[in-house]
Amino acid sequence: MINSFSLFAHITPIIRSSLHSRYSVISSRKAMSSLAAAPYRHVMMPFSPAQDAQVHGNSALTKLTDAIPDLKIYTRSSPHYESLRGVYNKLITAQPLAICRPTSVAQVQAIVKTVSGLGIPLGVRGGGHDVFGRGCIADSVTIDMRELDTQELSQDKKTVKVGGGITSKNLVGFLGSHNLCTSNGFAGEAGWTSWASWGGYGPLGDYVGLGVDNIVGAKIVTASGDVVDAKGDSELLWALRGGGGNFGVIAETDVRVYPMSTIQAGFIVYPWPETADVLLRLQALLDSGVPDKLCLQAGFTKGEWGLGMAITYIWPEAETIGPESEEWLQKLKGLGTCIVDTVAETTFEAFQASISSAISNPVNVTSRHISISKFTSDTLNQLIGACESMPAEADCSITCTILHGKAAQANVLSAFGTRRPHIMLHINAVTEEAAHEHVAIAWADRLVDGVEATGDSIGSTYVSFMESDKDPKGCYGENWERLKAVKKEVDPNDVFRFVHGRIPAA
């Protein structure tokens, strides 16, 4: 799952486009649609048992097809296999034994029951944007959730019930047709459920909370194949709000939604030599107090214009777009010499689409993250130095998600660990050739090491952006032992072990 990857690596064409259109799609807001979401669904994958489900004498697959005769299962000889297997990060080349596309929760139950008794790995895939490939496990039976992507808005339009395979852009599009939104990232192709349940850092977090804060209920298929409705103050619901798919397949979630007809959003770009001064002034502004509805990110990249730093600005409250939002926008522009300002009234759907279009195609990507308590001279020296040493073999970017509002507030109803103001640095390096991966790794790791050496780091805070071989205990903080107890109760045999921030059963 990937949230803001390469946002600023592709900012030049986005800025150029926005200067012409100013996100004018606001004038074409969809008419109010029904409470169900037929237009905002995945296209059903064609399936022919004769072509797609050849088991080639494999006893495990034979048992699976015998147990679930109507299951859409795609083995390695299927003409659709590679299109289903492929993920966002092209460096992930693992080949599952078979990929299943369930069309009902009952089929998910049957897959889990059957596979857990066969002694072979079980994988679960949402959108396929996890850059570490935890939805594409070698020799596994993989549950591909993408056809379980129903959406239904409640009658009072305060919550939406979504299937576990829903993507961010489809959720945003459906809610946008009702002038609503919820916490989301910028990568429209990312699976919303996994993004949200492991934390859900995103550009609206300070206004509406993290992804985990907006899950109000869930339907989970546990390792035994049973369906559990997690709601209220249940321990399982608390655990999956931060521990995600460690406890089972999240087949459905109930999600809190918010009125959001229009937003004010865009990029503010400053001259590269002013970078440190601008961000230190921004930190002083944050320290003095800013409203939750001022949502900010900062980003660094090298493009056709050379090195650049920009602030992403979003004001998501339509009722206060005007004098109040303009006051804060002018404060941001006054942090330095504003050389580009693309801020305009738009919709979150349009703004997400303008960014997501640049980060949808698969790439060879190396990704790291580290969080800091605030911008300091030492951390900025490391960030600026890393930018000035970006290797020629890689397209590098750093996105800084700034948490100061609701996203940073304590929430005892979730297991997400880091509840304090901080800045999460998402570090990415894309290489045209896979053979240059070592160059990307060296650059990204050097930056992480440099930030840690300043003493300003608070370590890793987001398991979705953490390498699989790293210990996630620090991300969960004081919730670690409680999470282990839940894991031991619902998945004692560690069936769901190929996940973000793995929580051991023992």
From Swiss-Prot:
Enzyme class: oxidoreductase
Phenotype of the disrupted gene, per the record: Impairs the production of aurofusarin and leads to the accumulation of a light yellow pigment.
The entry's keywords: FAD, Flavoprotein, Oxidoreductase, Secreted
Pathway in which this enzyme or protein is active: Pigment biosynthesis
Chief location: secreted
Domain FAD-binding PCMH-type: 92-260
Pfam annotation, one family: FAD_binding_4
Induction text: Expression is regulated by the aurofusarin biosynthesis cluster-specific transcription factor aurR1/GIP2.
Subcellular location(s) per record: Secreted; Secreted, Extracellular space
Cofactor: FAD
Gene Ontology cellular component list: extracellular region
Disulfide bonds: none
GO function terms (MF aspect): FAD binding; oxidoreductase activity
EC number of the protein: 1.-.-.-
SUBUNIT field: Might be part of an extracellular enzyme complex composed of GIP1, aurF, aurO and aurS.
Family assignment from sequence similarity: Belongs to the oxygen-dependent FAD-linked oxidoreductase family.
Summary of the function given for this chain in its UniProt record: FAD-linked oxidoreductase; part of the gene cluster that mediates the biosynthesis of aurofusarin, a red mycelium pigment which is acting as a mycotoxin. The first step is performed by the polyketide synthase which condenses one acetyl-CoA and 6 malonyl-CoA units to form the first intermediate, the cyclic heptaketide and yellow pigment YWA1. The C2 hydroxyl group in the pyrone ring of YWA1 is probably formed during ring closure by an aldol-type cyclization reaction.
The name this protein goes by in its record: FAD-linked oxidoreductase aurO
Lineage, top ranks: Eukaryota, Fungi, Dikarya, Ascomycota, Pezizomycotina
